[in-house]
A protein has these predicted regions:
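Structured segments of extracytoplasmic/periplasmic soluble domains
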Residues: 61-69, 83-90, 104-107, 211
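Carboxylate-dense, calcium-coordinating segments in secreted/extracellular and ER-lumen proteins
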Residues: 40-44, 51-82
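Exposed beta-strand-loop-beta-strand "reactive/processing" segments of non-cytosolic proteins
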Residues: 216-240
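Gram-negative bacterial Sec-dependent N-terminal signal peptides
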Residues: 1-22
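Short, charged early-sequence alpha-helical segments and their helix-coil boundaries
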Residues: 71-83, 90-103
């Protein structure tokens, strides 16, 4: 396990100690509805049908505000429940868009309790687990573990807290992804100026989806860190979380993609 630097540790404690700030339903719901109207407008590539990419953009109103990442509060959750049970609305979504809505709704449960998700280092290097060497394997940190039976499930708060606790960097909100989107993220994101090899990507996808194959629960989040203990530089990257069917076992693969200064 990494030894946390005092700067990053204090930053993390401040993050968790600060009062939770949430996107107000008075602004997020109208913003969502406006995006949906645009997605069903004459200039939309899907016409009256809402595409997954359009829905994802619309639903960001519930987790982002001008101040940064925000959480889904109880009023927003009630609205999302109404829309989940709105048959005409659900029928206007493509199949993958409907899956995104359901996954987003499940993850962002307006329960701001972080359940005890342990993340321990795995046996073997990323290269051995992916079956290939290259920039992806060289810059991947892999951990996995359980929430004890009866002590909760992997929701938004749990994933975020576990990542920062065991990997160190503060992290943005997790969002659902498909296997196709996982392949795109792993294969097209530059890692310190290099492109991952096909073998690395295929190996990583196989390894990650061992956990999510039956559950179809895959999530991605971006992270940045100011002078984390593992680098004298400011760093950034992303993390993939694969969650089991019972939402208790989680495998996380964090990828360090770039340095961007040491101020």
């Amino acid at each position: 396990m990494k030894t946390l630097s005092m700067t990053s540790l204090l930053s993390g404690l401040a993050l968790f100690a600060a009062p939770a700030a949430f996107a107000s339903s008075t602004t997020s719901i109208p913003a969502f509805e406006a995006s949906i109207s645009t997605a069903q407008g004459p200039l939309s590539p899907g016409g009256a049908t809402i595409l997954r990419s359009e829905l994802r953009t619309a639903m960001e109103a519930f987790i982002y505000d001008t101040g940064g990442p925000q959480g889904v509060d109880s009023a927003e959750r009630a609205y999302l429940t109404t829309r989940l049970n709105d048959t005409p609305f659900q029928q206007s979504l493509t199949g993958t868009a409907a899956k995104y809505y359901a996954d987003f709704y499940e993850l962002n449960d307006a329960t701001f309790t972080s359940y005890p998700l342990y993340q321990g280092s795995v046996a073997g290097t990323a290269a051995s687990l992916f079956g290939a060497t290259g920039p992806l394997a060289s810059n991947a940190d892999i951990r996995e573990g359980y929430i004890p039976n009866g002590q909760g499930i992997a929701n938004q708060a749990t994933l975020g807290t576990a990542f920062t606790t065991y990997f160190e960097p503060p992290v943005g909100p997790f969002q659902p992804i498909t296997v196709k989107e996982l392949i795109e993220r792993l294969g097209t994101t530059s890692i310190k100026g290099s492109t991952p090899s096909v073998d690395e990507v295929e190996g990583a996808v196989a390894y990650i989806t061992q956990i999510s194959r039956n559950s179809n629960r895959l999530y991605v989040a971006d992270w940045t860190c100011r002078r984390c203990s593992f680098s004298p530089w400011n760093t950034r990257g992303y993390v993939i979380a694969a969650v089991s069917t019972d939402r208790r076992f989680v495998r996380m693969v964090s990828v360090w993609t770039a340095d961007f200064g040491n101020d």
